[in-house]
């Protein structure tokens, strides 16, 4: 009888999967091995990224009975959530992102009297900062910018449209933008796209990325529309979104951070596979390996001492004893325990021991497998994240590096200096607030940095503003 055949996936060619006709028994066996491998070692991380040839495919969602088109983020529209998961699963990338966010935050967003280095003390400004927790909004903002290279802030105006009364950060992972029209997206949809419903989605008009303040003034009828030369009627909208994006090649609607290369090449997977491989190696070899010699009379002696005469029960008792010996030698909780057994002597004075246990490979040391490779992978991840390994602690692995204090100070100062461009982009919404509220002539915005000093200055650090 001819064996039933089936298709076995053997490779990929672009958008096509390659199959071969194989006996069903072979297909079942191979797929079982593939499933077990994926369970232990996971998929390639690059698989979460879409290779779609279309730059801005659109989907539609109905909100309050009105259809809204949006550009999905990734092939399944869940790419930012996948990025969160991938970063969170790796201790190097997690710590690098935390470090990047903290360094970019610096001393936080601060307001100064224009023309001086004195902190602003205006009651109205201080009340505005307090009621909107601008320090927290700014921290959330720079965190999103480090993860996704853009951030979105929602501003809410008073009913008469004369003041900004509320500022709220919108998580970038929840933001989906409208398709571009004349180079601009008209709105942003904010929702948890893992379980989005029309009732939980929020649509916000998106101000022009280049000139958000001018766009706001036009929408409120305060300035003429550059396209028509006339003033519009004041819009009924009182909430608007401001997008701050780090420039990237191609200016895609969702910026592609440079550090995404850790998934598009091999280093993220190399680090993960090394850790997974070491875990299973330790799990399968950590228990001591023993050779146990048991006298042929030992089993009968055990049964006789316990007065077991039934043949079936004797076999059960022998099986139980074998299991007890195995567990004693292999289980970690038995380390350091003693096992007491009896022995006899013959007339010649020779000892006859019932049980002998020998440790095999007792002098062999293990655990150093792939240590250098793990350090190399960790350094590669830090490089892609723009963080020197010494800035976040010693490189994970057995090979440690330790720069001098001067080197670490210069590395930290260099890292802080590179945040200037990020601060310029992140501060755009706050300049909009300042101009709209009429504070621009009295106050200025600065994001002071922490700069390490030398010991001869008798100070540990100093604050420098940009």
Please report, for each region that a protein language model flagged, where it lies by residue.
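Conserved aromatic-histidine-acidic binding/catalytic patches
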Residues: 87, 97, 109, 113, ...
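Short glycine-rich, low-complexity/disordered patches
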Residues: 63, 97, 102-123, 139, ...
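C-terminal anchoring/interaction modules
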Residues: 2, 327, 413, 417-466
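Long amphipathic alpha-helical segments
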Residues: 182-211, 284, 288, 316-402, ...
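Extended, non-catalytic structural segments that build the interaction scaffolds
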Residues: 68-69, 75-86, 306-316, 347-382, ...
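C-terminal structured domain segments
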Residues: 83-95, 99-100, 106, 112-115, ...
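Structured, contiguous alpha/beta core segments that scaffold functional sites
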Residues: 2-81, 123, 127-335, 466
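Generic structural "secondary-structure junction" signal
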Residues: 114, 147, 294, 359-362, ...
């Amino acid at each position: 009888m001819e064996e039933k055949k089936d298709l076995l996936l053997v490779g990929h060619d672009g958008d096509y999967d390659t199959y071969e006709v194989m006996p069903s028994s072979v297909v079942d066996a191979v797929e079982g091995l593939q499933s077990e491998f994926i369970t232990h070692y996971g998929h390639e991380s690059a698989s979460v990224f879409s290779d779609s040839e279309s730059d801005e495919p659109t989907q539609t969602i109905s909100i309050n009975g009105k259809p809204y088109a949006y550009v999905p983020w990734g092939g399944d529209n869940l790419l930012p959530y996948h990025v969160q998961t991938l970063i969170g699963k790796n201790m190097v990338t997690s710590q690098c992102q935390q470090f990047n966010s903290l360094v970019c935050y610096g001393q936080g967003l601060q307001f100064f009297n224009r023309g001086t280095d004195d902190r602003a003390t205006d009651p109205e400004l201080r009340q505005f900062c307090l009621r909107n927790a601008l320090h927290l909004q700014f921290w959330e903002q720079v965190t999103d910018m480090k993860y996704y290279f853009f951030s979105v802030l929602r501003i809410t105006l008073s009913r008469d449209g004369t003041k900004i009364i509320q500022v709220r950060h919108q998580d970038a992972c929840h933001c989906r933008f409208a398709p571009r029209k004349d180079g601009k997206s008209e709105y942003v949809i904010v929702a948890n796209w893992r379980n989005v419903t029309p009732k939980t989605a929020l649509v916000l008009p998106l101000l022009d990325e280049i000139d958000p303040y001018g766009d706001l003034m036009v929408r409120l009828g305060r300035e003429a529309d550059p396209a028509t030369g006339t003033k519009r009627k004041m819009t009924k909208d009182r909430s608007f979104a401001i997008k701050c994006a780090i420039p990237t090649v191609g200016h895609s609607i969702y910026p592609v951070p440079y550090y995404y290369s850790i998934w598009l090449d091999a280093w993220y997977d190399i680090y993960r596979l090394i850790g997974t491989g070491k875990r299973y190696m330790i799990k399968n070899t950590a228990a001591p390996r023993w050779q146990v010699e048991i006298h042929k009379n030992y089993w009968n002696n055990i049964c006789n001492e316990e007065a077991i005469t039934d043949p079936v029960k004797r076999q059960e008792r022998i099986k139980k004893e074998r299991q007890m010996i195995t567990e004693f030698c292999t289980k970690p909780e038995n380390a350091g325990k003693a096992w007491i057994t009896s022995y006899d002597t013959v007339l010649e004075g020779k000892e006859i021991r019932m049980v002998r246990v020998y440790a095999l490979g007792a002098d062999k040391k293990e655990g150093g497998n792939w240590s250098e490779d793990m350090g190399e992978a960790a350094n590669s991840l830090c490089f892609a994240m723009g963080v020197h390994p010494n800035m976040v602690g010693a490189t994970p692995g057995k090979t440690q590096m330790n720069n001098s204090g001067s080197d670490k100070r210069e590395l930290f100062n260099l890292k802080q200096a590179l945040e200037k461009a990020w601060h310029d982009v992140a501060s755009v919404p706050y300049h909009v607030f300042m101009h709209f509220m009429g504070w621009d002539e009295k106050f200025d915005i600065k994001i002071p940095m922490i700069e390490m000093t030398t010991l001869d200055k008798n100070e540990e650090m100093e604050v420098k503003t940009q």
